[in-house]
């Protein structure tokens, strides 16, 4: 799902309530924290041409190789900066999920697209991460003469952490008999 139902209802002001309980697949265990999530795409445009003369072209796939290497460095930087023992995987993740480029083995790749997913820790902000990624990609591809476009595939869900002594968390823990848990997926919270 697009996990936008609760947000839409809140924006419409209906119904007016102090809080809401949103059903998620957690075995009735209340969620006190979840990672944020975003899905984006990096689109690179080079210059295609025949493979017999690469000097007349600009290979977008080779540029994407450099971008991927930098994204993997960024992933390690985030891992060292953001840690929380609340989560089974105690650091942010960046998954390189899908790559498409080129149109024929005997042609220089003129375009290459990379789709990725990130799971953000509390304290990380979606737009700041997106700005960091755009800056890093520009740093890699601008000297290569490659055009870059950034696309948001899913607006994202910010990371969540329940306020200390949350009345709603205490009530749901009491009603379910379960202590609040942290999950690595985004909820509508």
PLM features: residue spans?
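Acidic/histidine-rich catalytic neighborhood of metal-dependent amide-processing enzymes
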Residues: 1-39
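Hydrophobic beta-strand positions in extracellular immunoglobulin-like domains
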Residues: 44, 118-120
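Short, solvent-exposed beta-strand/turn "edge" segments of beta-rich domains on protein surfaces
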Residues: 33, 104-109
């Amino acid at each position: 799902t697009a996990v936008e139902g609760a947000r839409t209802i809140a924006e419409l002001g209906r119904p007016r309530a102090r809080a809401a309980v949103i059903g998620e697949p957690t075995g009735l265990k209340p969620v006190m924290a979840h990672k944020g999530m975003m899905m984006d795409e990096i689109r690179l445009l080079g210059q295609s041409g025949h493979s017999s003369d690469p000097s007349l072209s600009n290979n977008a796939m080779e540029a994407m190789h450099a971008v991927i290497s930098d994204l993997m460095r960024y992933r390690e930087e985030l891992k060292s900066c953001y840690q929380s023992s609340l989560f089974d995987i105690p650091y942010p993740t960046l998954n390189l999920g899908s790559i498409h480029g080129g149109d024929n083995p005997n042609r220089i790749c003129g375009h290459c697209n990379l789709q990725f997913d990130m799971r953000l820790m509390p304290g990380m902000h979606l737009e700041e991460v997106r700005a960091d990624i755009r800056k890093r990609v520009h740093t890699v591809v601008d000297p290569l003469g490659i055009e870059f476009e950034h696309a948001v595939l899913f607006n994202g869900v910010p990371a969540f952490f329940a306020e200390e002594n949350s009345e709603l968390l205490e009530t749901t823990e009491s009603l379910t008999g379960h202590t609040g848990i942290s999950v690595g997926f985004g909820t509508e919270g």
